[in-house]
UniProtKB/Swiss-Prot annotation:
Keyword terms, alphabetized: Cytoplasm, Molybdenum cofactor biosynthesis
Protein name: Sulfur carrier protein FdhD
Localisation: Cytoplasm
Known role: Required for formate dehydrogenase (FDH) activity. Acts as a sulfur carrier protein that transfers sulfur from IscS to the molybdenum cofactor prior to its insertion into FDH.
Pfam families linked: FdhD-NarQ
A GO CC term assigned to this protein in UniProt: cytoplasm
Molecular-function annotations in GO: sulfur carrier activity; sulfurtransferase activity
Main location class: cytoplasm
Keyword match Cytoplasm: yes
Family according to the record: Belongs to the FdhD family.
Gene: fdhD
Length: 277
C-alpha cells in the first residue's frame, strides 16, 4: 500500500485514540478490509525535567492521567502541588511535562523508582518486593450504597467507551452516584490509566469522594484498590474478579471491594457494612 493511501486510511476516523488500518479476516484472506484499532503510545511523565515513568496509554486526557497518577502514587497531596503541565510530542511517543512544588519534588527524588513501560502496569520496575504497596490511611465509614442501583450503571458504563465501542480494546472507570447514575468516566487501553484519569479529573474539578463509588470494567488488582484508597474512595466495584492481594489491601484499608458485577449479581469481598439491597 502506498504511503499516501495509508495516511488517508489513518485519518478516516475523527475519534482520538483510534486509527483505521488494513487487515484480513479468517474467512477471506484474499481481500483486505479496513477496521478500527485502538492507539497505544508510550507516555512519559516528566517531573521538573526528570523522567519518572513511562506507561503505555491511549493518547487522550493525558493531563487527567498525570494528575491522577501523581495523586494515587502519593507524589502529591492535592492538585495545588502541581504548578504547570504540558503535553508535548517526543521522538517515540508523548511527554507530560509536570512542574512540581519544590517540596514535592524533593520527596519524589528521595523515593524515585523507574517503571518499565507496559500497558497500565503499576508494579513494573520497582526495585524491591518491599517497595510494592504504599502506606494508606484506613478509610472512614461515611456512606452506604444500595446494590439495586448497580444494574442501571452497568448498562451505561459502555457509554464512556467510544473507542472501546469501535475496537473492543479499552477499559473504563466511572464515578457512580448513590442513585446509580454515572456522572463521569474515562477509558484507556490500560485499566490503571483509565482509573488514574478518573481520579485526576474529579480531583481537578474539586469533586468529593463521598456519596458514590468507582465502577471499573476490568478486574480488581491490588493497584486498583490502592489507587482508589489513596484518593479517598471508599467503595470499588469491578466487572471482573479481584485478586488475593487486592482483597488483602482492601481489608486493611477499610475499602469495600465488590467484583463480578453483572445485572442482578455481585460478589462482596470486603466490608459489606457499606452495602444494602
Amino acid at each position: 500500500m502506498k504511503k499516501t493511501q495509508q495516511k488517508e486510511i489513518e485519518n478516516v476516523t475523527n475519534i482520538t485514540g483510534v486509527r483505521q488500518i488494513e487487515l484480513w479476516r479468517r474467512d477471506d484472506l484474499q481481500h483486505p478490509r479496513l477496521d478500527e484499532v485502538a492507539e497505544e503510545v508510550p507516555v512519559a511523565l516528566v517531573y521538573n525535567g526528570i523522567s519518572h515513568v513511562v506507561m503505555m496509554a491511549s493518547p487522550k486526557d493525558l493531563e487527567y492521567f498525570a494528575l491522577g497518577f501523581s495523586l494515587s502514587e502519593g507524589i502529591i497531596e492535592s492538585p495545588r502541588d502541581i504548578f504547570g503541565m504540558d503535553v508535548v510530542p517526543s521522538c517515540n511517543g508523548l511527554e507530560v511535562q509536570i512542574e512540581l512544588s519544590s517540596r514535592r519534588f524533593m520527596g519524589l527524588k528521595e523515593r524515585r523508582r523507574a517503571l518499565a513501560g507496559r500497558t497500565g502496569c503499576g508494579v513494573c520496575g520497582v526495585e524491591q518486593l518491599n517497595d510494592i504497596g504504599k502506606p494508606v490511611q484506613p478509610l472512614p465509614f461515611t456512606q452506604t450504597f444500595d446494590l439495586n442501583k448497580l444494574d442501571d450503571a452497568l448498562r451505561h458504563l459502555n457509554d464512556f467507551q467510544p473507542v472501546g465501542q469501535l475496537t473492543s480494546c479499552t477499559h473504563a472507570a466511572a464515578w457512580m452516584l448513590p442513585s446509580g447514575e454515572l456522572v463521569g468516566g474515562h477509558e484507556d487501553v490500560g485499566r490503571h490509566v483509565a482509573l488514574d484519569k478518573l481520579l485526576g479529573r474529579r480531583s481537578q474539578e474539586g469533586e468529593s469522594w463521598q456519596q458514590g463509588a468507582v465502577l471499573v470494567s476490568s478486574r480488581a488488582s491490588y493497584e486498583m484498590v490502592q489507587k482508589s484508597a489513596m484518593c479517598g474512595v471508599e467503595i470499588l466495584f469491578a466487572v471482573s474478579a479481584a485478586t488475593t492481594l487486592a482483597v488483602e489491601v482492601a481489608e486493611r484499608c477499610n475499602l469495600t471491594l465488590v467484583g463480578f458485577c453483572k445485572p442482578g449479581r455481585a460478589t462482596v469481598y470486603t466490608h459489606p457494612q457499606r452495602l444494602s439491597n
